[in-house]
Amino acid sequence: TGGLWGLDKKAFTMGRIDIRAKFDSAQGFWPALWLLPQDGDAPNSGYGELDIVEHLNFDPYVHMTLHSEYTNLVDKVNTPNAVQAPFNEGEFNIYGVEVHEDKVVYLVNNKEVYSYPRLYPEIPGQFPFYGQKQFYVILSAQLGGQWVGSVTAAHLPAGLYVDWVKCYDAIENE
C-alpha cells in the first residue's frame, strides 16, 4: 500500500485534469486516482471529493465517483454520483475530470462517460467543486479493505503505473 499525495505541494483550481495510467488486476488490489480540496475535510464537511478512477480486483470496468455533502448525507438516491466505465484492460488509459460551472464531466480516453449536474445552486453542499477552491491530486494503490476484500498473495505483485498528470485551466467563460 502506498501513494503520492499533493497536499500542500501543488493544488489546482478546477478546469480539467487528465491522468495517463495503467494498473494490474489482483484480488484485494485497489488503485485510485483522486482529488481532495486543499483547504478542508471531504466530503461530509461541505467540501467535495472527485474520484477520477478506482479499480477493484478483476473488474472489467473502472469506478468514477463524485462525493459531496449532498450525495453522501442528503440525497443518496435521486442524484446518481457514480459510473462504472469500460477501459482498455492492461493498457495505459487517460482518465479525466472536467469541472464546469454547471456540471462535472468524467472521461476515459477523451470520451465522456458521465456527467453530474449542478442542480441546486442554493444548496452549497450539492456542488462544492466550482469556483476558486483548490484541489490536490492523490495517486494511491491500496491492498485490502472493506470494498476490495482480502488480498490473494498468489496474485501479487500488483502495481499502479502513472505516465503523466496534466492539469488545464478552465477555458470557457463561466
Regions found by a protein language model. Give the residues of each.
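GH16 jelly-roll
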Residues: 1-174
